[in-house]
Amino acid sequence: MCMMSHNKAFFLSLQHAAVSGVAVCLSVRRGAGSVPAGNRGKKTIITEYRITGTRALARCPTKPVTSMWNSSWTSR
């Protein structure tokens, strides 16, 4: 039973990470369209996206964080 709840929380956090990743990707695309094609601007946008993406992914697999995610999801 415990494993099931952990699995559920894991998938919820994974889903959340995917959703936020898509949102970031969309905002990056929009920004890339409006910003003139400067290498410097593109680089910062990409690194920002990479940092947020890895941060979201790093949050998922760890069990203590997953239980934290679960409590935050149920409180909502």
UniProtKB/Swiss-Prot annotation:
Any one Pfam family match given in the protein's UniProt record, by short name: DUF5429
Taxonomic superkingdom: Viruses
Protein name: Uncharacterized protein UL131
